[in-house]
Every structure is written in structure tokens, then in C-alpha cells.
Amino acid sequence: RGTKHAEWEPYSDARETAIKHGADIALLFENDILIDGDRCAPLLLDHDGVAYHPKHSDGALDSVTIEQIGAGLEAAGIPVRPARLTLSMILRASEMIVCGSGMGIRAVGTIDGRTIGRPQGRLFQAARESWLARLESGWVSAGDP
């Protein structure tokens, strides 16, 4: 919880394990709840049309990237809300992406060989467009409009 602030070991260990198993990213779980990504923030589109990200109260860190794209997603008709994300919720999701200031927006197609919704769908398109618009506007801090 909160290890990105100084204690990187759980994140780097997860990343190393993911690479050894041929994965592109690692997702960190605690007590069957998705907490974070190794160098990104996960965001999933549920069948209710809402994009959910891990809750801060469950141990997730605030995501500058999600904060930056949130208004664009909302404008595209995709509400963004924190939630307690379980593996079963992820597996039934319409779509899942990961976001990070260093990696941008990436679609998640599978987790451990299991297909996750429809990659590069509505959530991916809206998030990517919003992210590119934020980059083009030259934002400097999370508080920039």
C-alpha cells in the first residue's frame, strides 16, 4: 500500500515475475482485490458503461494519468469511478486498459491467457483521444485545465 512513494520492491518484483512469464505488465492484488499495476493504473469498463479504477482506500495510489483523462472520458459518456475491483469483475469487463504517464494508454487483451472484453474498444479510444489532447495542450501539472 502506497509503496510507489518510496518502497518500490513489490512493484519491481511483480514486474520481474511478469517479464519471466512473458507478460507485458503486472497487476498487483491484495486479498483478491486489484490494487495497482506495476507501472500503470488499471481502468476497466464494466457492462454498466462506467469505467472503474482501484480505490485509494483499498491501497491504490492516485493516478495522474486517470486524473488527466477523466474529463475527456466523462465528455465521451463514460463516467469514471473508484471501485473495489475483483478478478471476477475484471474477467466479465467489457474492456480493460492501463494508463501511465510513461506508457500512455494501452489496451489489455488477456490476463493469464483469459480474454478481457474487447480490446481497443470504446474505453481505449476515448482514453487515448483524451490523453493525446492533454499532451498536445502541454499540461505541466495535474491541476492544469
Placement of each model-derived feature along the sequence:
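Helix-start/capping segments and mature chain N-termini
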Residues: R1-P145
